[in-house]
């Protein structure tokens, strides 16, 4: 039987996160949303298309008014307004109206882009998240943040749009490419660090089972991660306060991601950004030295970087200034008071940021000397 997490919006039921180990229950969930009387469009990328789109289209055949798919080229570089325009055009040509529905089948890029289309097409159309990466299941598919990149600004154009459903087939994690899998773990780790010290300890205790991708262990891990995010976004759905805590590692992480022209995965950059944030927390005497090194080294068994070559600290600093989390010219930095407790800090100086960037700006061999 599927496990479910109901998510509230303004203290009222909004949507369910459904955890399954196959796609077999998807139509039943869609039918509950009135999908039989709707046109459905699967929006997916060129990588995920060949893996799951045909299977899901087969489930939909003959059960709804119309089932089509739109495939865009895979990669962060295609998460932009040009792709959004192409999806708009496709939906218009296929006759989609405000009563129809989009299905975001893929990772974080697909969910962000599809959600933004759903928020803006005809002033709003329903959409469902079907995340197929650990990063999307653990983080980006939940909470209603949607958006695309604009020039050098990541997620600069966006909207809050809650999905009608988040359907997670956890079995896809078994076959996920290794680097993609571990990239997603950075968001799992982030969730534990900001809100749940016992979960952090659980991750350490279950390290082997996670790396072996034991399905029951992965299910518990994803459910616990989603539970943390659910609590945070229910209290602060539009990021006016504590929802910003979910941005641990993202200020410097986004800057590195852009500087490296998206050669590094998002989760890899979040890991680097989290190490940098933990370093600043140590230097501000929030964390002990031992806690900093423990956090840093926790990423290593999960094949996540704790240092990066060939970055210009001044350029990274400059890119942090274009971060959308700036407020009145000040960066809202997320720091750690201890493992399991994060805080918003507006006092981080350029010198502290540069020192943190220097800390991660060397070879991994040097990091263990």
Predicted features, each with a name:
Residues 1-101:
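ATP/NTP phosphate-donor binding region
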Residues 3-4, 188, 286-369:
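C-terminal charged capping/lid subdomain of soluble metabolic enzymes
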Residues 10, 116-209:
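A glycine/threonine-rich phosphate-anchoring loop and its flanking beta-alpha core
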Residues 10, 34, 95-97, 120-121, ...:
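Solvent-exposed alpha-helices and their adjacent loops that cap or buttress functional pockets
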Residues 88-105, 114-129:
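Non-catalytic interfacial helical region
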Residues 109-116, 137, 255:
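Short glycine/serine/threonine-rich phosphate/pyrophosphate-binding segments
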Residues 201, 206-314:
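Active-site segments that bind and position negatively charged phosphate/pyrophosphate groups
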């Amino acid at each position: 039987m599927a496990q479910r997490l109901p998510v509230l919006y303004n203290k009222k039921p909004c949507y369910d996160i459904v955890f399954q180990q196959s796609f077999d229950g998807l139509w039943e969930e869609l039918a509950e949303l009135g999908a039989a009387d709707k046109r459905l469009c699967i929006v997916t990328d060129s990588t995920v298309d060949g893996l799951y789109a045909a299977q899901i289209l087969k489930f939909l055949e003959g059960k709804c008014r119309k089932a089509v798919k739109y495939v865009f080229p895979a990669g962060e570089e295609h998460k932009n307004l040009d792709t959004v325009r192409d999806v708009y055009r496709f939906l218009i040509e296929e006759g989609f109206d405000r009563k129809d529905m989009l299905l975001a089948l893929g990772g974080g890029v697909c969910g962000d882009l599809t959600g933004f289309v759903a928020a803006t097409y005809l002033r709003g159309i329903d959409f469902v998240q079907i995340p197929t990466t650990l990063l999307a299941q653990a983080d980006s598919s939940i909470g209603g943040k949607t958006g695309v990149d604009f020039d050098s600004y990541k997620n600069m154009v966006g909207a809050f749009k809650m999905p009608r459903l988040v359907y997670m087939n956890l079995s896809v994690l078994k076959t996920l490419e290794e680097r993609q899998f571990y990239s997603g773990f950075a968001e799992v780790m982030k969730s534990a660090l900001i809100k749940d010290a016992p979960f952090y300890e659980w991750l350490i205790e279950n390290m082997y089972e996670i790396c072996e991708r034991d399905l029951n262990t992965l299910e518990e891990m994803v459910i616990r991660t989603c539970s943390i995010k659910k609590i945070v976004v229910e209290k602060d759905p539009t990021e006016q306060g504590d929802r910003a805590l979910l941005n641990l590692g993202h200020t410097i992480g986004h800057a590195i991601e852009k500087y490296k022209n998206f050669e590094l995965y998002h989760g890899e950059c979040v890991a680097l950004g989290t190490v940098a944030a933990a370093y600043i927390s140590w230097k501000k005497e929030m964390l002990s030295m031992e806690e900093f090194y423990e956090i840093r080294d926790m990423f290593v068994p999960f094949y996540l970087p704790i240092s990066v070559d060939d970055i210009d600290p001044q350029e990274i600093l400059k890119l942090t200034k274009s971060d959308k989390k700036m407020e009145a010219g000040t960066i809202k930095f997320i720091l750690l008071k201890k493992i399991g407790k994060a805080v918003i800090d507006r006092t981080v100086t350029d010198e502290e940021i540069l020192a943190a960037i220097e800390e991660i700006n060397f070879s991994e061999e040097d990091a263990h000397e």
